[in-house]
Amino acid sequence: MWLRLGPPSLSLSPKPTVGRSLCLTLWFLSLALRASTQAPAPTVNTHFGKLRGARVPLPSEILGPVDQYLGVPYAAPPIGEKRFLPPEPPPSWSGIRNATHFPPVCPQNIHTAVPEVMLPVWFTANLDIVATYIQEPNEDCLYLNVYVPTEDVKRISKECARKPNKKICRKGGSGAKKQGEDLADNDGDEDEDIRDSGAKPVMVYIHGGSYMEGTGNMIDGSILASYGNVIVITLNYRVGVLGFLSTGDQAAKGNYGLLDQIQALRWVSENIAFFGGDPRRITVFGSGIGASCVSLLTLSHHSEGLFQRAIIQSGSALSSWAVNYQPVKYTSLLADKVGCNVLDTVDMVDCLRQKSAKELVEQDIQPARYHVAFGPVIDGDVIPDDPEILMEQGEFLNYDIMLGVNQGEGLKFVEGVVDPEDGVSGTDFDYSVSNFVDNLYGYPEGKDTLRETIKFMYTDWADRDNPETRRKTLVALFTDHQWVEPSVVTADLHARYGSPTYFYAFYHHCQSLMKPAWSDAAHGDEVPYVFGVPMVGPTDLFPCNFSKNDVMLSAVVMTYWTNFAKTGDPNKPVPQDTKFIHTKANRFEEVAWSKYNPRDQLYLHIGLKPRVRDHYRATKVAFWKHLVPHLYNLHDMFHYTSTTTKVPPPDTTHSSHITRRPNGKTWSTKRPAISPAYSNENAQGSWNGDQDAGPLLVENPRDYSTELSVTIAVGASLLFLNVLAFAALYYRKDKRRQEPLRQPSPQRGAGAPELGAAPEEELAALQLGPTHHECEAGPPHDTLRLTALPDYTLTLRRSPDDIPLMTPNTITMIPNSLVGLQTLHPYNTFAAGFNSTGLPHSHSTTRV
């Protein structure tokens, strides 16, 4: 900080004192030094006009200044008739546009009940601070911020820390290594010049939230840009009602927030070269909901050619909250609240356009727990089909992908039922699992089996009575289901055909009062390390007590992330070396982050003791991926396999299925409405909240009949699969034995090919005898797909009352029970030509 001195006195003195002369001299020197160090404001041309930014120094000797261009428009304001429509390119401007202030944020409301379970801890713990970032929202909000490094200081700082007498250090320290400067004087060091001397890689950050809130203004990309020598871009996109409202037809197709992101990427691809960026090395990255957006962008053919790599932090398109399968339901609720619920969807949308943005975003529309009210939808265009189907079809194989999870992502799911001092009681544990099953899976006939199996899998039987152990396993339950399993499945599908894939597990978090002391690395805890916050100290959003270890780990993470943006390999070109920060050797120097593949499933453990490990939580991933979908429909198999098992009588004590919050505590999540499939008979057996339920039963002694039923059910399932496997193997063996007998003679077989007869022969051979009646329940080809059980996973990701998946050419998200909407049209029948921007919704849904 400059020493601020006042001007000298104008009174004349025949004999000025020495102190006055010294003061005057220092004042002039200060002015001269300030004038000499003040760099001119940087300017840059774009296709739409000229921008004036600001050169901002960073408060660290190892970080060079960054040119910031804030509030750059990437699309026309989506206001008036353009609300609920895809974005259009921005208008051009004359003269020089000032880009030195953050733009307005998109309309949102954080004063209602925010879905804390999907938001990072640093967001929910600082809502008062977050509110200062979203003041004065405006629908004219489609802007981005560009952070451009001016010096490549990381390598020179490390060299000067180790060899302060080197010539490049004597020339002016970190400021000596200017862009384009010749570093021939490398003193013979082999790895002296490892920087990008040409166009710089570009990293575009998609902010998270819950699709309802957030802004790119909250994240400063300066440190990441300076340390990693990359251009970092943050952006705003429409959120909530304005970004994701959908009527399920052409009136309002939805996905406007995703289309904003695509338009921003198009702007970056066309203009980043003016900033010194490389349009052929654009990486999109995000955390949480932002990661889900990144995952969805890799599956949309409208993103093709706009970026080459993706970093998916703690999220996936396969998570239950990634896609909204019931948009019409929540659109109807919103229309009811604001007086626009008319039968014709076009009239409904016109009515919603007449409402103010404030009135729309202030409506409290709460989704089912673990789902979203307004988010991306399967529209047959931007998202052509269910994300898992698109992944299986290889839609994202052209991208290099790095993805991972944090150790304790599910903290917020547990905090509401946990006493930080005492852990989780047995009753709380049982209630949490029951509530989880009810809200996520609805009320299937096999709910009891599903619930008890989950409780069985997440009980530490060596320490089952320890409340702290229950707390740990409960966090693991939510972490595994909501983050780990979707991420691992995404990695498996991407790496199946050899596409570059890297997986990590983040095990570190800063010390702060935002979280309980017992918590691990929670959702969003990797964000400050990715953006280098420990290097400059605590901030308003990240009030942590950062140590040298935090600074070192942040440097490591930024090196991995920017290396991946540069080459697609997090190990190169910049090696892990942080001796200029920490005197101790960096353990990451000896760790090589291996590629992920479905067989070995290698991943990097990111923490103070890094190591490459394999098969991250493989047992739990297999449980959620394979067994739970099978148990979800297990009752269907019992109809024809369980003929000797006696069904236990219904429990009349209401103790095993009670959903009342024990000990008088309140539970913030409402039980979903009973679906039509839930019979009156079952409803009569449920607990009535208006009547006195009596005291809860003590946990011990415990009735193990349910666990025994679960064991028998699982055993029956495995026996059934073994029968199928034996039948398939027997058939293949018998077929091979008969192949020589079926081989036609050369004279008879020369006239007609064998291909035409093969399907009929296989079909006849698959018709087994009467002793194999279990195998006749489905088509033959389903019987032999032993490694691919009936895929109920798509159903389980949906809300309890969702409809089955239909073909991409039909509406896939409208419940049959919704009354009052007109007949909808296939997505490939839109009239072309209403949108001249080259954006989606005017194109065919068929990829050429």
From Swiss-Prot:
Residues 1-37 form the signal peptide. The keyword Glycoprotein applies. The modification Phosphoserine is found at residue 745. The modification Phosphotyrosine is found at residue 792. Disulfide bonds join 106-141, 340-351, 510-544. It is a single-pass type I membrane protein. Keywords: Asperger syndrome, Autism, Autism spectrum disorder, Cell adhesion, Cell membrane, Disease variant, Disulfide bond, Glycoprotein, Membrane, Phosphoprotein, Signal, Synapse, Transmembrane, Transmembrane helix. Belongs to the type-B carboxylesterase/lipase family. Cell surface protein involved in cell-cell-interactions via its interactions with neurexin family members. Plays a role in synapse function and synaptic signal transmission, and may mediate its effects by clustering other synaptic proteins. May promote the initial formation of synapses, but is not essential for this. May also play a role in glia-glia or glia-neuron interactions in the developing peripheral nervous system. This is Neuroligin-3.
